Amino acid sequence: MAPSLLLLSLPWPVRPGPLQRCWELLQRQLQQSWSRFVSPPWAPALAVQRPSILTELAHDTCENKENSSFLDSIFWMAAPKNRRTIEVNRCRRRNPQKLIKIKNNIDICPECGHLKQKHVLCGYCYEKVRQETTKIRQQIGAQEGGPFRAPSVETMVLYTGEKPSEKDQGKRIVERNIKRPSWFTQN
């Protein structure tokens, strides 16, 4: 293997000092030591190692006079070479790990009676809570008169027939003209 050397020239100016002196000394020594060898000007090169069979194939394709590239041979290499048997396909498709697993964690919601997963809020009950919360937020927005005007006090929701207690003094009170839902606790 022939010795190779790469000389770098910095595009930015080097500050005067020990770094510049070392750099200039290195360049001078390299130029002196390599000046006795006759070589073409240095340029980046690409070396590719490949099997010898590819060179033989390249010589064979010259006879075809077609415009072909090495990428043409890569695409057919990735194609399947043998057909899978029906037994293998069935085993692959009907793999026990791919079958739908039976859920044993399904329970009945005690509030509404719909099916739900254990330790998860029922979807129907969640929808009721979301709708009630949306109505309360709309009422609060109408009282404030716009965004960014909310007072910095705690908000309390009172339904029909409820009165604020002594500890609720100083809180912002939102009154709803309907009966309190059973799932909406007062605390």
UniProtKB/Swiss-Prot annotation:
Its main location: mitochondrion. It is found in: Mitochondrion. One of its GO terms (cellular component) is mitochondrial inner membrane. Keywords: Metal-binding, Mitochondrion, Ribonucleoprotein, Ribosomal protein, Transit peptide, Zinc. Pfam families: Ribosomal_L32p (PF01783). InterPro entries: Mitoribosomal_protein_bL32, Ribosomal_bL32, Ribosomal_zn-bd. GO terms for molecular function: metal ion binding; structural constituent of ribosome. GO terms for biological process: mitochondrial translation; translation. Component of the mitochondrial large ribosomal subunit (mt-LSU). The mitochondrial ribosome (mitoribosome) is a large ribonucleoprotein complex responsible for the synthesis of proteins inside mitochondria. Component of the mitochondrial ribosome large subunit (39S) which comprises a 16S rRNA and about 50 distinct proteins. Belongs to the bacterial ribosomal protein bL32 family. This is Large ribosomal subunit protein bL32m. It comes from Mus musculus (Mouse).
